[in-house]
Regions:
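Accessory nucleic acid-recognition modules appended to NTPase machines
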Residues: 1-104, 109
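Residues at alpha-helix caps and immediate loop-helix transition turns in enzyme cores, especially N-
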Residues: 103, 127-131
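C-terminal structured domain segments
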Residues: 132-135, 148
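Short, hydrophobic beta-strand segments that form beta-sheet elements in well-ordered domains
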Residues: 143-149
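Domain-level recognition of nuclease-like catalytic cores that cleave nucleotide substrates
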Residues: 150-174
């Protein structure tokens, strides 16, 4: 793992076991997600099933017309944007009550003395149970919450809906 991180080919996103404004202090070094540092290389790797992968796949991808779950691709792009600003990447996961499932907020950013939870969606933006639960559970630490997707700017109750391409501008405000 250390060799991968030192080579800068991957980005580590650490789980925080007790989210607060001191994310680095509460990170769990044994629980993390890895993203590739080069989104172009990652895109080529996941769509190149054969030496003659059709160019139409890339055209559909760029035109948002590819019928595939691209959540992992968008999450990877967001991780790359976060770390390009010199920040570390963090996320948070916790058990749902009376369930074998977990909640997960894709990214946590420090917003001055508060936290900015960020959820990344590849398609539907109406379902955002995890970020809603996070904002309720950790309301004393949350400044605002953002859901990033391919959709236009909007608002859903207290959740700010933003296109992924706006993340660098959002991060300038932090």
């Amino acid at each position: 793992m250390a060799d991968l991180l030192d080579s800068k080919t991957v980005i580590a996103c650490y789980n925080t076991y007790n989210p607060s404004i001191t994310l680095a202090q509460t990170k769990d070094d044994d629980t993390f997600k890895l993203y590739l540092s080069d989104i172009g290389l990652f895109t080529t790797m996941i769509f190149k099933a054969s030496p003659k992968t059709d160019e139409s796949i890339y055209s559909k991808l760029l035109g948002d017309k590819l019928s595939a779950d691209l959540g992992y691709l968008y999450e990877n792009a967001v991780a790359q944007m976060i770390t390009a600003t010199g920040r570390s990447a963090y996320y948070h996961t916790w058990e749902k009550e009376n369930s074998t499932h977990y909640y997960e907020v894709d990214f946590l950013l420090q917003d001055k003395a508060k936290l900015l939870p960020v959820e990344v969606k590849s398609s539907a933006t109406k379902k955002h149970e995890s970020i809603d639960a996070f904002c309720k559970k950790y309301s004393q630490y949350v400044s605002r919450a953002i859901l990033l997707s391919q959709k236009d700017v909007g608002k859903d109750n207290n959740l700010n809906l933003k296109p992924i391409y706006m993340l660098p501008f959002i991060m300038e405000e932090l």
